[in-house]
A protein has these predicted regions:
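Extended, low-complexity, turn-rich repeat/linker tracts enriched in Gly/Pro/Ser/Thr and Asp/Glu
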Residues: 95, 108-117
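C-terminal membrane-anchoring or membrane-association module
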Residues: 209-233
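Boundary/junction segments of secreted and surface-exposed precursor proteins
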Residues: 21-40
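Terminal, low-complexity interaction segments
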Residues: 133-191
Length: 233
C-alpha cells in the first residue's frame, strides 16, 4: 500500500510541474471611440487585471491633430526616421506576474500628404532595432488594418515594464496627418511559477530508488524458488 501511495504522490507532483500554456487573448485594448483625436494622451479601454497599461501618448517631435474616434498627429518627419516622431504606450505586469505578447493589431490612416513609412521599436534594446522591418503605406487616405507578429524569443515571460513606439516618417507635408485606431495587444499574463527544479529531481530520485529496491527482492525470490523446485525433484 505504501508503494502505491508513493507512486500516487510522484504522479501528482509531476503534474504540478507541468505548465499548460494559456490561449492568447486580448490583454490590452485602446479603442479611441470617444476621442477627438487631438488629446494630449488617451487612456486604455481595458487590460488584464494583472497588467498595467499606460495612456497612449505621442513623441515630442509631433503635434496633436483632430481626427474623431482616433489618436492623431501631424508634423511628422518629411525625410528619414526621426527618433522623436512616434505614438507610444507602456505595459507592465504586476509583481508576481509575467507577460507574453504575441502580436499587435491596429488600424491606421494617413491624410493625402501624411507619412509613407512606419516601423515599431521597443525599450528592451533602447529603441535600437526594428520589430518586423520597415513598412510602406500606399499613397492614399484609406484606413488599413495592420498586424505585427512579435518574435517569441524576445517577448515571452517578461517580468518588467516594456514601452512600444510606433514611428512614422517620409510625410509628404509637415501638415499631413497620421492617425491610429482600435489598437489591441494579444498574449497572456500569468503568475510566475514557483521554482520546481529541485522538486522534480527529488521525485525522480525517489521513483528510481523504489523501482530498484522492488526489483531486487523479486529477482532473489524467483531464483530461490527455482532452486527449491530443483531440489525437490
Amino acid at each position: 500500500m505504501f508503494r502505491y501511495l508513493v507512486y500516487s504522490w510522484i504522479f501528482s507532483s509531476s503534474l504540478s510541474l507541468c505548465e499548460i500554456p494559456l490561449a492568447a487573448a486580448v490583454i490590452a485594448y485602446y479603442s479611441f471611440d470617444e476621442a477627438l483625436g487631438n488629446e494630449t494622451v488617451y487612456g486604455v479601454d481595458a487590460s488584464e487585471e494583472a497588467l498595467w497599461a499606460s495612456d497612449m501618448a505621442r513623441g515630442p517631435g509631433v503635434q496633436p491633430s483632430l481626427g474623431s474616434g482616433t489618436f492623431s498627429a501631424r508634423q511628422w518627419s518629411r525625410s528619414g526616421l526621426d527618433m522623436e516622431d512616434y505614438f507610444s504606450f507602456t505595459l507592465a505586469p504586476l509583481p508576481g506576474f509575467e507577460l507574453t505578447i504575441d502580436q499587435i493589431q491596429w488600424n491606421e490612416r494617413r491624410s493625402s500628404s501624411g507619412v509613407r513609412q512606419w516601423l515599431w521599436r521597443c525599450s528592451l534594446d533602447d529603441y535600437t532595432l526594428n520589430i518586423g522591418g520597415v513598412h510602406t503605406i500606399p499613397d492614399n487616405d484609406l484606413t488599413r488594418h495592420q498586424t505585427l507578429p512579435l518574435p517569441s524569443d524576445t517577448f515571452t515571460r517578461l517580468d518588467e515594464a516594456i514601452t512600444f513606439r510606433l514611428y512614422g516618417y517620409m510625410a509628404e507635408s509637415s501638415q499631413g496627418t497620421w492617425r491610429i485606431d482600435d489598437l489591441r495587444l494579444e498574449g497572456t499574463v500569468s503568475a510566475v511559477p514557483e521554482p520546481s527544479g529541485i522538486h522534480a529531481t527529488i521525485a525522480l530520485l525517489v521513483l528510481f530508488s523504489i523501482l530498484k529496491r522492488n526489483r531486487a527482492p523479486q529477482s532473489n525470490f524467483e531464483t530461490t524458488s527455482t532452486f527449491q523446485d530443483e531440489m525437490s525433484v
